[in-house]
């Protein structure tokens, strides 16, 4: 394949390249991912969303960390105020970080992925499932406006630490299908994000996204994030869910009156609400461009 179609979009300025590959024909190796995501020699992005059709007789990919229903290929049981769940995912989100590594889930990425499916006429507006490496994830996509993903409820896994340029921060380890460390500080501006935080390899054998959080007012938190395999980004959806989970269980953090946590990131605002074994992640997601990508030119580019 010399030329492939692509789209570019973002969710609170967490930007992605979308590669429609319905028949699973594209060989997306780490070097190609790095070249595409490079902001000088490629398109530039925080990651890649490859769109693959799920065969009718195949179940979405699952893994440890998914809830029991997701691991079995079933949608979660509906709860009060939520519509009935669809039966199966028709599309699989193959997500890659900008460094070429494979990631379990991406909260902002799945919302953009879902927006693309509706805009492209591959799914109807409303609720449907997206297949991911942590199991099928329900999404709510209106014809226009914010997109909501219902991720598995985060799991708090005890304390952890990260060193930012000589400053040690204590935090809470969280799994949202992917690993996070949430650290609450008095002032975000005091934390140096110019270098990658150093993590304990015993606590995080596969690395982690590190979220640093400042309390703004009841129900509103400010967050910066250093994503594994990417660097500091303007937003991180699964990170916002991890932050809200820590806040939900912390007595010293004032809770929101309406149940929705507002997580303010450099790229905008995300809204988080807990409902049983799921957490709703809501916010904007928009496709801004499309075209064709010349793979041969990328492969011949320097470095």
Swiss-Prot record:
Cellular component aspect of the GO annotation: cytosol
Compartments (UniProt record): Cytoplasm
Gene Ontology terms, MF aspect: diaminopimelate epimerase activity
Annotated region (Disordered), positions in chain: 60-86
Keyword ATP-binding tagged: no
Primary localisation category: cytoplasm
An annotated GO BP: lysine biosynthetic process via diaminopimelate
InterPro entries named in the record: DAP_epimerase_AS, DAP_epimerase_DapF
Keyword match Phosphoprotein: no
Reaction equation(s) it catalyzes: (2S,6S)-2,6-diaminopimelate = meso-2,6-diaminopimelate
Protein keywords: Amino-acid biosynthesis, Cytoplasm, Isomerase, Lysine biosynthesis
Gene3D superfamilies documented for this protein: Diaminopimelate Epimerase, Chain A, domain 1
Described purpose of this protein according to its UniProt entry: Catalyzes the stereoinversion of LL-2,6-diaminopimelate (L,L-DAP) to meso-diaminopimelate (meso-DAP), a precursor of L-lysine and an essential component of the bacterial peptidoglycan.
Protein name, per record: Diaminopimelate epimerase
Organism for this UniProt entry: Acidothermus cellulolyticus (strain ATCC 43068 / DSM 8971 / 11B)
Protein encoded by which gene: dapF
């Amino acid at each position: 394949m010399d030329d492939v179609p692509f789209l570019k979009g973002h969710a609170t300025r967490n930007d992605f390249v979308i590669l429609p590959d319905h028949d699973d024909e594209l060989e997306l190796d780490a070097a190609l991912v790095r070249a595409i995501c490079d902001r000088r020699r490629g398109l530039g992005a925080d990651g890649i969303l490859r769109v693959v059709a799920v065969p009718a007789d195949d179940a979405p990919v699952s893994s440890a960390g998914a809830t029991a229903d997701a691991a079995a290929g079933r949608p979660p049981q509906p709860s009060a105020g939520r519509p009935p769940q669809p039966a199966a995912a028709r599309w699989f989100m193959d997500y890659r970080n900008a460094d070429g590594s494979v990631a379990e889930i991406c909260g902002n990425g799945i919302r953009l992925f879902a927006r693309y499916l509706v805009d492209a006429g591959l799914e109807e507006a409303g609720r449907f499932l997206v297949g991911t490496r942590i199991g099928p994830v329900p999404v709510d996509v209106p014809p226009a406006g914010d997109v909501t993903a219902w991720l598995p409820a985060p799991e708090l896994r005890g304390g952890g630490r990260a060193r930012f340029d000589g400053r040690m921060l204590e935090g809470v380890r969280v799994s949202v299908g992917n690993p996070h460390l949430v650290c609450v500080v008095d002032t975000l501006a005091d934390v140096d994000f110019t270098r990658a935080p150093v993590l304990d390899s015993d606590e995080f054998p596969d690395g982690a996204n590190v979220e640093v959080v400042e309390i703004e007012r009841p129900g509103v938190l400010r967050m910066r994030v250093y994503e594994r395999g990417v660097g500091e980004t303007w937003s991180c959806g699964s990170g916002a869910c991890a932050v809200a989970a820590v806040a939900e269980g912390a007595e010293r953090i004032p809770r929101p009156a309406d149940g929705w946590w507002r997580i303010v990131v450099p790229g905008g605002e995300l809204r988080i609400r807990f409902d049983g074994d799921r957490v709703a992640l809501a916010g904007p997601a928009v496709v801004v461009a499309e075209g064709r990508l010349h793979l041969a030119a990328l492969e011949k580019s320097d470095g």
